[in-house]
Every structure is written in structure tokens, then in C-alpha cells.
Amino acid sequence: MSYFDINKVNYEGPKSNNAFSFKYYNPEEKLGNHSMSELLRFSVAYWHTFTADLSDPFGVGVAERDWDSLDEMEKAKARVEAIFEFMEKTRIDYFCFHDVDISPEGASLKESNENLDIIVELIKEKMDQTGKKLLWNTTNNFTHERFVHGAATSSNAEVFAYAAAKVKKSLEIAKKLGSENFVFWGGREGYESLLNTNMKLELDNLATFFKMAKSYADEIGYTGQFLIEPKPKEPTTHQYDTDVATAHAFLQKYDLDKDFKFNIEANHATLAGHTFQHELRYARDNNMLGSVDANQGHPLLGWDTDESTDVYDTTLAMYEILKNGGLAPGGLNFDAKPRRTSFKQEDLILTHIAGMDTFALGLRVAYKMIEDNFFENIMDEKYKSFNEGIGKKIVEGETSLKELEDYAFNINTINNTSDHLEVIKSQINQYILNINNKD
């Protein structure tokens, strides 16, 4: 059975009016020594694409999906067929999932694991047949009512144990399927109020949880990259991994920073009061950029995520990613869903085409900027006072407050220069327009 009645999506260039074609993403086209598919490493998210029903806090699900009329296990099997057809037709090489995305929870942990075993075998067969790969998997330790107080940070030790058992199973799945990364997102790892929260105990327990996970991965020979996905809130009022800087400090405190990097989501940066580029830059500067959840927050809605369609944002994001040397073994996972009003099955294809093209265009622009040393030249000019004289001594740690005081006494007039920030923004616009015109 075919779930998507279209041909494989092809690159037709920016002048094409075919909605089911790529305008900027040409998988085999090389930029330098790498193809676009190697540089972008696109991934489809199982949850938003194949399990989400487009419900929201004010309305029931409206998504029309061929598999939704089936019973739970048959539905899970149908979704396996659907996602591999989807990846083939969209030319996406990777996928990601939570444990409960791929199979239903049973009446007990044992039954849940048995359900997982059945579906994982089907996924493994499909992976072997198609060459598609698992970018990352993770454990859903936030949806079920047992996680009302958290998972690793729960006040109930039995919940901690249950969450740990689920992670153990997910790590075994990661090894079996060759998952290139393993992600932790702590949607319930935080608090509603400090009035009844032992923050130190909860953070200590969270660190213990991560250490046990890494220890078990080593024990079974799983070598995938471990990733933490920061988010400041939603669903919990205050989540402990608020942003990259906060989570980095946590990892450093508990001596986990050599074992983990970050999976950075664009909309989580927005919720934290940062730009997407800020989070990517902080992670890159600290050698902690591991992977990306590609989406954008709706400017009027905090809780929603859409496919990326902002070329300005994707250009700056791809600049950071290219300067990072790429994302491998991470990738660009479309942790996004269609708008509620885009409820047809074909909209799943169309939204991914939009997101892939937007990142591909951003890649083209960012690559050209790096070729031209655009930002590098700006930085060199702005900070040139630190390349010689007293500035160089400051950078190299070869001066003191006393010497700087003596130096300052001899300054007659301090002359600052304008950043011309508006000119820089205008030049970025011109890069985007020039890339488009060139194609």
C-alpha cells in the first residue's frame, strides 16, 4: 500500500512552480568537498509527522491520516511503512523517534517492551532494505501521568526507577538500530514552585541518572553521541536545562561535559529569550554543538512549532553549523508540524519541502559568506585594537591593573568607531538576493 500518491521529489530550481519539487535543495550538488545532503543531514521526526493529530489546547485533532483507523499495534506497523515511503519520496536519509512514538505503551513495562521489540524488528528490516538511518532516538519520560512530578527529578523514587528502566530499553534499541545519537529532553525535569522543591537533590539525582545512562551505554558497547536538548519551560514552569549556557554549567559541575553535547532547537531558543544563532554560537564556541531540531516558533504563539521558512534565520544558523565543521554525527531534524489548518496527508510532504528548501537556501548563502570572509572581515576590523600594543598584551594575559592604569593616564581622547550594524544587515539581505538571482 502506498500512503503518499506522488513521485519522488526532485530538484527543479527556483523558477519551478511545482509545489512537489525542491527549488534550492539539490542533494547531490557539491559545495566545496561535500554534497548538500552531507552538509544538511536532514531527518524526519516520527512524532510530529506520523503520530501528531494537530490537536491544540483548544481543539481536537483534525489530521487526516490513512493509518489512524487501525488498532494500536496495526497502526504502529502501518506507520513504519509510511515513514520509510515518506523518506524515500522526500530524499531524507535519517529519522528520529521517542519510544512511545513507534509502539503503544502496554499495561506494564514488560508489555511495553514487548511491543517495542516487534516494531523495532520491522524498523530494522526497513533500514536494512533501504539504507535509511536512525539519527537519534530518545525516551518519552514526560507524557504519562506517572511523570507528573518529573522523571529523573521526580520526588518519587519508584518513578525514577521506572524512567531509568525505559532509558535502558531505549539504549538497547539505539545499539540495535545503530542510532548515531541519543537524546535527553527533560520536559518534566524542573519545578512548578520552589516552595516545595529540593532543587539540590533533584539536580544531583538528574546527574546520577545521566551517569547511569552513560555507564550502561559503555557496558553494552553503544558508542552514539549523547545529547541534551535545552528548553526553559513548557510543559514545566521552570525546566533545569533552561538554555545551552545553563545546561553547560550543569554538565561541567557534575563532570559530564566530556560525555554530552547539545541538540539545539530553534523554538526553544526563542522561549529562552535568545536567538537561534545565539544558542548555536554558544555551543559552537564551547565545542558542544551536536545536533539541531529545525523549526521556528510562531511569533504570536509560544507553544507551537512550524517548519522553518525564515531564510534570514536559516542563513545565520547554517553559518554557525558550517563554522562548526558541520553537524555529523548530528543532523537537522525537522521537529516541526504542519499548521492545524494544513491537515491533509500531502501537507506532510509539502511542509518538509518548504523546510528543506529554506535550509538549503540558507546553506547556499552562508557558504558564499564564508567564501568571502564576510563576517570574519567585520570581526577583524572591529577588534583590531587587540592585535597589537596594549590590546595584544590584554589578550595574552601579559599585563596588570597597574600597567593598565599607567596606560589609561596617558590617554587623551578615546575614539570609538561606529559598528554600521544596519549596513551589515543590508549586506546580508543582498547576499540572499544575489544567491537567488544567480540560480
From Swiss-Prot:
Disulfide bonds: none annotated. Homotetramer. It is an enzyme of class 5 (isomerase). Pfam families: AP_endonuc_2 (PF01261). The lineage of its organism: Bacteria, Bacillati, Bacillota, Bacilli, Bacillales. One of its GO terms (cellular component) is cytoplasm. Belongs to the xylose isomerase family. GO terms for biological process: D-xylose metabolic process. The active site is at H98, D101. Mg(2+) 2 binds at E265, H268, D304, D306. Involved in D-xylose catabolism. It catalyses: alpha-D-xylose = alpha-D-xylulofuranose. It is found in: Cytoplasm. This is Xylose isomerase.
